[in-house]
Amino acid sequence: MQYNNYYVLLEVYETPAPSVLTMGGAENKIIHFQKCNGGIIVLNNKPEATSEDRTFFGQPRGLSTLFFTEMWERFSYYGMRAILIYYMYYSVTKGGLGFDQGTAASVMSIYGSMVYLSSVLGGYLSDRVWGSRRTVFIGGVLIMFGHIALSVPAGKMALFVSILLIVLGTGLLKPNVSEMVGGLYNEGDTRRDSGFTIFVFGINVGSLVAPYLVGWLGLSYNFHLGFSLAAIGMFLGLVQYWIGGKKYLSKDSLYPTDPLEPGDMKKLVVRSTIGLVAFILVLLLMALLGSLNLTNFVLLLTIIALATPVIYFTIFLTSKKVTATERKHVWAYLGLFIAAMIFWAIEEQGSSVLALFAANQTNNVVLGFHIPPAWYQSLNPLFILIYTPFFAMMWNRWGKKQPSSPAKFATGMLFAGASYLIMVIPVALFGSSAKVSPLWLVGSWAVIEIAELLISPIGLSVTTKLAPKAFQSQMMSMWFLADSAGQAVNAQIVKLYTPGNEANYFLGVAIVAIVAGIIMVALVKPIKNLMAGIK
């Protein structure tokens, strides 16, 4: 039934579940109706949030549910990530898989890339099939089973099964949790940036604790015990999300904003089948040519990860569902996306290049106490937790006078470059064979986390502001595709990080970031013009 450009949810007491009537349209709103006396239908519209809802540190109560969901999901992910590179390259006699370090670093990067690439799938299924809340829950279940797979001592097969499950699960969960955070705020609500900053704070609470606990279990006792603890963390997150979601999240998030028409499902199945068959044919061709190995497979995934955002930007810019104003917003977002991709390429090397530096070129004995290399992964969230209150207060105090999102991005890029300039110094002074003070790693992370707070929460926030109505969750996926593309690049460039070349490597990465920051400074005004008043 078509009417008034709204999707309508009709709640009928006599039926076990609500039915959805598609009532067309550009607005993609969900309005709640309820059946009452005499069969009269009355409006019961409940917005995602109101400006009066300030029960969670001045923020909407629903933010607490999403805060703790992401906290536990990040606990599981970063706990696993803190020990995974060591699990891959430690010898079999030490409980590892025996990969060489270069391969382990490359796999770590492409793994992270695929985790965020799958967010495209999560955004699509949320928008068209399940709605945000269901998609997040299904993703959490897959993540939990992915960690369970790693907890079983079944060698490389368990690793690859785990990678597949966590890649799919994270893709379903991450973009939709962030999209729901954006939905908690009305347009023009100045709490949005501070709300996302608090949300990122929650992410980093889980990320801070995980390397200590999972890293301690994994490196001191048994890798599989560490992975088991990561699985328990995701289970706790699912329980909290299930309970809190019923109480504090709007029913709107249970339903897709742009549901599939009956004929669309067939098209989806056909296109998915074609894509899968094409991928298999490429693998078969590589096998026939004798080039199907782990290195070339990683290269293939790198190409896919870089091509995907290009395809999606093309769709957004040419879709008839996108208005002229929204199209300008997408062009503005493209500039921010490229800057974010470069930033994440640097920041995400913490789990690969800096993890290797921590294990091989850092003096990890301080006052007689041995620091497990995995513990350095807590530096990222530690500094985020230290800095976040100051950034939140600063943005709140400045209010509408705060710098624009492009200006924050430009400043962040310069800080990111500076963080790698710091890493040049110890190698240049003491040589690549020396074990240097841990303070060099501490200093580098301290600087890049300033960059992260200028880019990550702001990027999450501006994505929800610039997203076209018809592609809200899929646009949210684009933010994670920036991370995916950055890590895909890493999967290739980390191979340049070799003994004796560390200083050149750090210097080259720093120069790229600083030049990108300078270019971003020059583009602040043009991007602001395209954003048309959105900060």
What are these regions (language model features)?
Residues 82-103, 352-373:
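Short amphipathic helix-loop junctions that connect adjacent transmembrane helices
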Residues 157-173, 433-454:
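Hydrophobic core of transmembrane alpha-helices in multi-pass small-molecule transporters
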Residues 141-155, 414-432:
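C-terminal ends and interior cores of transmembrane alpha-helices
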Residues 109-124, 378-391:
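Central cavity-lining transmembrane alpha-helices of secondary-active solute carriers
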Residues 120-141:
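Conserved MFS/SLC helix-loop-helix module at the cytosolic interface between two early adjacent transmembrane helices
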Residues 193-211, 218, 233, 478-490:
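Glycine-rich segments within core transmembrane alpha-helices of 12-TM secondary carriers
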Residues 32-61, 187, 215-351, 355, ...:
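Intracellular loop-helix junctions on the cytosolic face of multi-pass helical membrane proteins
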Residues 304-314, 372-398, 412-419:
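Transmembrane alpha-helices of Major Facilitator/SLC transporters
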